[in-house]
C-alpha cells in the first residue's frame, strides 16, 4: 500500500470530525477504503458500527469489492455501505413502528409521481408541462426544507402558490393512503424523526461509531441535516469532497455545505489531497487556471509527478458537421496507426442533443462507439411491467402498480371501468385492490366486466399466497401465467426488440433469485426488500449495465455522466458561448457551475485533451455565427495549440489594442 503524506494523514486521523478536500484523481476512493480497513484492523472498530455513504450504487459496490481484498466477507456484510437514500430506507425500516407506517410500503419513481399529479391537478396545470415540472420541483423543494403542506398553504400568497400548496396536500394524502413513499421521503422522513425524537437520535448516534461520506459536495439541504442528526460535535466522522467538482445544483446540491460543516463543527480538521495520479502536468495546469476564476471556500491546486505532456489542441469546425468529421478523422488516424485504441477515447458534451451529429458521422466512418444515455435498466417498459406486478404482490394497496398491470396483457378492462373503480374507491376511502373485492362494484359495472376483475383479483391473491411460500419462483410464475413473452412478441413485432426485451426479463428473473439467495457482499433479502431496492435503484441510477464487459469502442457521454471516470484521450466538444457555458447559465449568472463542469471534463483526461467548437450552427433553420467559449480564453494560452480562426485573430487584435 503506497500512500503519500496527506493520504496517510487522512487515513490515520480518527478522533473528531474530518473534512478531506480531495482533488480530481487524488485517490479519494483509495483513502476511504484504507480508512475503513484502518478503523477495523488498527483501531478495533466493529464493522457493524461503521457506515459509509456514497451517491451511487456503483460506488458502493466498488468499495465493497475493493474491501474484499483486505477484509473477510462477514465483516463487509455487517457494515452499511450504501447510498444516502438506501441509508434512509434502512432507518425507516428499523423505526417503522414509531413512524406508524405499514412495513409493506411501496416506493414511487418519477413516472409514478407525474402520473399521480396529472390525475389530481387542475387542467391548467396538468396540460402545461412547464407548470407540472415546476410543481414537481416545488414539492421536492418543500420536502427538503421540511415544510408540511399546511405550512406551505399558510405562507402561499399568489393564486398559483395556493394551487400548488393544495396539490401538495392532495399528493401527500394520496401517497399515505396508498402506503407509498417517494424519493425525497427517504431522506426527509428519517431526518425529521431523528430531529424530533431524542431517544431514537441517541440510539442511532450510539450505533454509528464512525461515519464516512463520499462526494460530500453533492449533498443537498436534507442530506446535510441527516448527517448532523447522525452525528454530534464530538462524533468521529470523515467527509470527502471537492468544491471544484460540485456540478449538481440543478438537483439541489449545495457546495456551501463544505463551508457550513466548518461552522457547525468548530473542531473540524481539514486535510487537502492535491497530488493527482491521473493527468499529465499540462492538463492539470490548464484545469487549475480555469477553476481559479471561481470563488473558493478553500484554496486548492492540483499537481502531478507525471510527465508534462503535449499541448492541448483546440479544433475548429466550420459547422457542427465539420466539427464531428474532424474528431472522427483524428480518431481514425491514431487508431489505424496503432497509436491508440477506440476505447481510449471519450467524447464529452454539455447536452444529449449534441451526440446526434457525432453518431451519424461515426456510423458513416465505421467508428465503433457506445453512448451513455439517461435510461435505466429498470425504466424499460417490460421491467416496469414486471416490477409493477411485484409491487402489487408485496403491497396490494399500491394503486399505481394496479393501474399499470390491470391491462398488461390485455384483459379487456377499459378506461371507463377504471374511472368508475377509482371514483368508488375514493368515495369509500379504499384502494383499487380493496374496492375490486367490494360487492358494490356489481352496481356500477356490467356482469361480464365484474367477472374479469374478480378473475384478476383471485389470481393476484393466489400469487400473494404462493409468494409467502416460494419467493424464488414467483416472477417466473407471473411471466408464465400471463403469457408475457407471447404478449411482447405480439406488441413489439420486430425480432431484435423482442429478443432484447425477453433477455431483459430473464436478466431480471436471475437477478431476483440471486438477491433472494444473497451473495458474497449482500445478505439474503426477501421479496419486499428486493422490490424496494429495485425501485430505488431505478430512481438513483441514470444507467445500469448488468454484466458490463469493456469493449473497444469510443465512449460518448455528457460531462455530467463522465464524473468519476477517466480516459487516455478526451474531446470536450461544443466549446461555444451558449453551449458551454449554456445560455441558461449565462442568463441566470450561474457561470461558476458551468466552469466546474468544464473542469470535471478536463480532469477526466490522462494524456491528451482536445477542445472543439464550430464557427456556425443551424438553429431553427437559421445559420448563426457562434463565438468560442469564454472558458477557452481563461486557459493558459501558451499551453494551447489553436487551429486558425478568423474570430480568434480578431480577438487577439482587439486584445493588443487594449
Curated annotation (Swiss-Prot):
Record PROSITE patterns: UVRD_HELICASE_ATP_BIND, UVRD_HELICASE_CTER
Protein role: Rep helicase is a single-stranded DNA-dependent ATPase involved in DNA replication; it can initiate unwinding at a nick in the DNA. It binds to the single-stranded DNA and acts in a progressive fashion along the DNA in the 3' to 5' direction.
Protein's name according to its UniProt entry: ATP-dependent DNA helicase Rep
Family, similarity comment: Belongs to the helicase family. UvrD subfamily.
Domain spans labelled UvrD-like helicase C-terminal: 281-564
Broadest EC class assigned to this enzyme: isomerase
Catalytic reaction annotation: Couples ATP hydrolysis with the unwinding of duplex DNA by translocating in the 3'-5' direction; ATP + H2O = ADP + phosphate + H(+)
Keywords from the UniProt entry: ATP-binding, DNA replication, DNA-binding, Helicase, Hydrolase, Isomerase, Nucleotide-binding
Record bears the keyword Plastid: no
One Gene Ontology cellular component annotation held by this UniProt entry: cytosol
Record: residues binding ATP: 22-29, 278
Gene Ontology molecular-function annotations: 3'-5' DNA helicase activity; ATP binding; ATP hydrolysis activity; single-stranded DNA binding
Domain UvrD-like helicase ATP-binding: 1-280
Known EC number: 5.6.2.4
Assembly notes: Homodimer.
A Gene Ontology BP annotation from the UniProt entry: DNA replication
Family matches, as InterPro entries: DExx_box_DNA_helicase_dom_sf (IPR013986), DNA_helicase_UvrD-like_C (IPR014017), DNA_helicase_UvrD/REP (IPR000212), Helicase_Rep (IPR005752), P-loop_NTPase (IPR027417), UvrD-like_ATP-bd (IPR014016)
